[in-house]
C-alpha cells in the first residue's frame, strides 16, 4: 500500500531534529496528497499509518490531524474530518488528553483551526462541543471560552515541550497541582455549606438534611470513592516531587494524562461492576446525551 502511494503521488515524510520535541516537517508532496485526495485517503486501510513511524507514532495524532486541518473546509467536510479523527485514534495509545475524548456527531458543533502562537507550536485544532447539562470536573481545566454560551471548546495543540512560559490554555504544573489539591474534598465541602446555609428554623430538619446529604455523597459521589482518592493522592505526591526539577513541562503533562487515564479506567470499571454503586455525578466529560467512552 505504502509503495503504491509513494509511486503514484511521489510523496515522502521528512523528520527533522529539533529542540522542540515532536516537531516534524511534512514535505510539499504529502500536503498535495492530503489536499487533492482527502476523500480517498480517508477510505484507505489505516493499518499502513500505524506502521509508518514518520507519519504517526502512538501519540502524534494531533500533528497529523493538524496537517489535514490545513487543507480541509470544515463547513463542507466535517463528517469526513470526524471519520478521519476517529479512524486515526484507533491506532494510537490514549496517552495524551486529545486521545481520551470520544466525540460523536451528536456532541460536535463545529471544528476550527488553531494557529500556533510560539516557536515549535504549529497550531492544532479546536473542537466545539455541546455544553453538558451540569458542572463538570473538566471545567477546572483551562479551556477556550466560546462566544456561544451553549458550547465548550477544547484546543488540541501539537506542541510537546510544554514549558512555564506557556499561556493559560496549556496544562501547566501550577494548574495541575491546583486541579488535584482543589479536587473533590473542597467541592463537596462547598456543597455541604450550601445546604447548611439555607434558612431553616427547625434544628431537626437541618440535621435530617445534613445526614441525607452525607449519605448521598457516600454512595453516589465518584469524587469520594476510595480508589479515586488513592489515585489522586498518588499523583499529587508525584507532581509535588517535580516542583524543583528543571524541564519538567512534559513530565508534568505526562503525569496529568496518566492520572486522567487511571481515573477513566476506574470509572469504566465502576460502570461495569455489579458490586460498586453507579455514581450519579459525571467524569471525563461524560455527556448526558449520546456519549461513548473509549475503552
Swiss-Prot record:
CC annotations in GO: chloroplast
Subcellular location per UniProt equals: Plastid, Chloroplast
Alphabetically ordered keywords of this record: Chloroplast, Plastid
Q: Give the main localization category.
A: plastid
Write the protein's name: Uncharacterized 35.4 kDa protein in rbcL-atpE intergenic region
Organism source for this protein? Euglena gracilis
Source species taxonomy: Eukaryota, Discoba, Euglenozoa, Euglenida, Spirocuta
Amino acid at each position: 500500500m505504502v509503495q503504491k502511494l509513494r509511486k503514484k503521488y511521489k510523496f515522502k515524510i521528512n523528520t527533522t531534529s529539533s529542540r522542540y520535541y515532536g516537531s516534524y516537517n511534512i514535505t510539499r508532496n504529502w500536503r498535495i496528497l492530503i489536499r487533492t485526495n482527502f476523500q480517498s485517503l480517508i477510505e484507505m486501510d489505516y493499518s499502513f499509518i500505524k506502521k509508518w513511524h514518520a507519519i504517526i507514532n502512538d501519540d502524534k495524532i494531533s500533528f497529523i490531524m493538524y496537517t489535514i486541518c490545513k487543507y480541509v473546509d470544515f463547513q463542507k467536510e466535517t463528517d469526513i474530518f470526524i471519520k478521519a479523527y476517529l479512524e486515526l485514534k484507533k491506532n494510537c495509545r490514549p496517552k495524551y488528553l486529545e486521545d481520551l475524548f470520544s466525540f460523536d456527531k451528536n456532541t460536535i458543533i463545529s471544528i476550527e483551526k488553531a494557529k500556533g502562537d510560539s516557536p515549535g507550536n504549529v497550531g492544532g485544532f479546536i473542537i466545539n462541543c455541546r455544553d453538558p447539562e451540569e458542572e463538570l470536573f473538566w471545567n477546572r481545566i483551562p479551556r477556550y471560552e466560546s462566544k456561544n454560551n451553549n458550547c465548550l471548546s477544547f484546543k488540541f495543540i501539537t506542541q510537546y515541550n510544554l514549558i512555564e512560559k506557556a499561556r493559560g490554555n496549556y496544562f501547566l504544573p501550577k494548574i495541575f497541582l491546583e486541579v488535584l489539591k482543589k479536587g473533590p474534598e473542597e467541592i463537596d465541602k462547598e456543597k455541604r455549606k450550601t445546604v447548611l446555609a439555607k434558612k431553616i428554623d427547625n434544628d431537626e430538619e437541618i440535621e435530617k438534611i445534613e445526614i441525607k446529604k452525607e449519605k448521598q455523597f457516600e454512595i453516589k459521589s465518584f469524587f469520594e470513592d476510595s480508589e479515586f482518592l488513592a489515585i489522586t493522592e498518588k499523583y499529587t505526591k508525584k507532581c509535588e516531587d517535580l516542583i524543583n526539577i528543571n524541564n519538567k513541562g512534559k513530565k508534568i503533562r505526562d503525569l496529568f494524562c496518566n492520572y486522567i487515564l487511571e481515573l477513566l479506567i476506574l470509572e469504566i470499571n465502576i460502570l461495569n461492576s455489579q458490586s460498586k454503586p453507579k455514581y450519579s455525578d459525571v467524569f471525563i466529560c461524560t455527556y448526558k446525551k449520546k456519549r461513548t467512552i473509549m475503552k
